[in-house]
């Protein structure tokens, strides 16, 4: 017993030390500084800045490397702990209803804003004068997309192939099936479930280690963007960029804000809570970079693991609010800029096609542009060659698309969890208010109690199973079951400095 108390005292001391961490050690501050330095380098030394692209690409590759195991462990263990397997279908069904509703609403918002503001009016550009070769690659990829092909691609060729390719929907498909099989097998699969729970510790520790490279990735990506495309490209099409950013801002704070308020939480508090993930997306233009951290934070905010594991990965393909706003807004901008008349009937056709083509857009940089090409290819009234107009500024709008997508998926997770009764309202309220302990993506605890709580979980081997719940103090009902290897993890696991 004394040994346990000594270990917990060490954990508390570690927490006190970490509570004094200076601001410059926080990941979001480092990412902000890296973005600023990247902008300056790209602006003053564009040749050097344009060569920084490998830094951003390398960081994205590192994160994508860990996404598959994070999704698998989260989904499989979450579903395995369900006593009612019908709940999996209910969660998926409610999530799809939410996705369809708000994705369509985002498309409509982009359409309405484009008609009211008309950002492309007065440009009088002849489509024949545009360089169609510049968008040939995107158009070719767009033609390869089809609804049937997208659905068939969800089924991997082999079990291992999904993890090798890193396809989010394929990994999610396998994870759901594996989690269901574990739940059906029941007690005989407890050893496997315990192993998966234990495996989450080093995997999420690896995520924290990889996130330490986030400032380098953000610096490289931003330096490349400014160095290659320059600030002049922003000025030339400032009306479109400004309209898109303002529309996304209003969608987040008015539409999603109303949804959040109706469901009992603040959109501002939620954005503050996931600020590290948003800054990471801002620096890398890739929403995939924030997926592991977002899943972790949504679970800590009180959403059940099974809901988080289903909603967020699925939302990365089916709930892309920012991409949807961009698609209809950009399509009408091209029509206005090239003086192409587009009737309300054409706009309805555009809306219907966009509802289909927007599903399955990947969370990587440039995916929105490919999806736009697929949409315009099916709408004969809008010249596809007009996409050359926005090719140079697409990178600058990619950040806003990705940030809006991330916020939309965070809201969706909380809402679906509440609909399903898998949300802890008190935990959500205290977490968003900043009163609850939050383990950041950098792996450092933001409050003293967080380190104590994490240490207790490691010490007592706590899992999601009810029989492993920690009493919360030395001498509690589970303290007598401490194993030597569990206590050793304090010094080699998540709490090691």
Swiss-Prot record:
GO terms in the biological process aspect are: L-aspartate transmembrane transport
> Its family?
Belongs to the dicarboxylate/amino acid:cation symporter (DAACS) (TC 2.A.23) family.
Chain intervals for the UniProt region annotation (Disordered): 466-497
Question: Could you tell me where the Basic and acidic residues compositional bias lies?
Answer: 475-484
List the molecular function annotations (GO) for this entry.
fumarate transmembrane transporter activity; malate:proton symporter activity; succinate transmembrane transporter activity
> Which protein are we looking at?
C4-dicarboxylate transport protein
Q: Which PANTHER family match?
A: AEROBIC C4-DICARBOXYLATE TRANSPORT PROTEIN, PROTON/GLUTAMATE-ASPARTATE SYMPORTER
Stretches that traverse the bilayer? 27-45, 60-82, 95-117, 168-185, 205-227, 237-259, 348-370, 374-393
| Coiled coil stretches, renumbered | none
User: Which keywords, in A-to-Z order, does the entry hold?
Assistant: Cell inner membrane, Cell membrane, Membrane, Plasmid, Symport, Transmembrane, Transmembrane helix, Transport
**Superkingdom of the source?**
Bacteria
Give one Pfam hit by family name. SDF
Q: Would you name any one GO CC term?
A: plasma membrane
Q: State what induces this protein.
A: By succinate, fumarate, and malate. Expression depends on the RpoN sigma factor.
Membrane topology for this entry? Multi-pass membrane protein
Q: Where in the cell is it found?
A: Cell inner membrane
Q: What does this protein do?
A: Responsible for the transport of dicarboxylates such as succinate, fumarate, and malate from the periplasm across the inner membrane. This transport system plays an essential role in the energy supply of tropical rhizobium-legume symbionts.
């Amino acid at each position: 017993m004394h040994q346990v108390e000594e270990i917990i005292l060490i954990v508390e001391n570690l927490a006190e030390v970490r509570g004094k961490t200076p601001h410059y050690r926080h990941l979001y501050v480092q990412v902000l500084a890296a973005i600023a330095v990247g902008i300056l380098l790209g602006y003053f030394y564009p040749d050097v800045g344009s060569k920084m692209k490998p830094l951003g690409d390398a960081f994205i590759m590192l994160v994508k490397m860990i996404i598959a195991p994070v999704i698998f462990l989260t989904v499989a263990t979450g579903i395995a702990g369900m006593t009612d397997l019908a709940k999996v279908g209910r969660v998926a069904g409610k999530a799809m209803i939410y996705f369809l509703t708000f994705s369509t609403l985002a498309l409509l918002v982009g359409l309405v804003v484009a008609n009211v503001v008309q950002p492309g009016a007065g440009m009088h550009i002849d489509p024949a004068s545009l360089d169609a070769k510049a968008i040939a690659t995107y158009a070719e990829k767009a033609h390869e997309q089809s609804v049937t092909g997208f659905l068939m691609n969800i089924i991997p060729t082999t079990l291992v192939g999904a993890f090798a390719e890193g396809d989010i929907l394929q990994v999610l498909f396998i994870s759901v099936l594996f989690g269901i099989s574990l739940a059906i097998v029941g007690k005989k699969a407890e050893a496997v479930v315990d192993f998966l729970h234990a495996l989450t510790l080093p995997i999420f520790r690896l995520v924290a280690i990889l996130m330490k490279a986030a400032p380098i990735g953000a610096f490289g990506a931003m330096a490349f963007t400014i160095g290659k495309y320059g600030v002049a490209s922003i000025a030339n099409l400032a009306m479109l960029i400004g309209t898109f950013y303002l529309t996304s801002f209003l969608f987040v704070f008015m539409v999603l804000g109303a949804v959040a308020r109706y469901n009992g939480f603040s959109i501002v508090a939620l954005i503050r809570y996931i600020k590290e993930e948003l800054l990471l997306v801002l620096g890398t233009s890739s929403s995939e970079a924030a997926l592991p951290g977002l899943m972790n934070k949504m679970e800590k905010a009180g959403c059940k693991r099974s809901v988080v594991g289903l909603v967020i990965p699925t939302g990365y393909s089916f709930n892309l609010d920012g991409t949807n706003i961009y698609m209809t807004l950009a399509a009408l901008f091209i029509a206005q800029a090239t003086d192409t008349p587009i009737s309300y009937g054409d706009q309805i056709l555009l809306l219907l096609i966009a509802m289909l083509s927007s599903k399955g857009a990947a969370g990587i940089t440039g995916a929105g542009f490919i999806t736009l090409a697929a949409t315009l290819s099916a709408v004969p009234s809008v010249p596809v060659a007009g996409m050359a107009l926005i090719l140079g500024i697409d990178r600058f709008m990619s950040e806003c698309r990705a940030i809006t997508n991330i916020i939309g998926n965070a809201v969706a997770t909380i809402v679906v969890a509440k609909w399903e009764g898998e949300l802890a309202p008190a935990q959500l309220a205290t977490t968003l208010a900043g009163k609850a302990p939050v383990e950041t993506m950098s792996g450092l605890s933001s409050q003293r109690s967080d380190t104590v709580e994490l240490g207790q979980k490691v010490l007592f081997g706590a899992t999601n199973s009810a029989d492993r719940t920690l009493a919360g103090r030395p001498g509690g009902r589970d303290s007598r079951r401490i194993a030597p290897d569990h206590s050793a993890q304090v010094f080699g696991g998540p709490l090691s400095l």
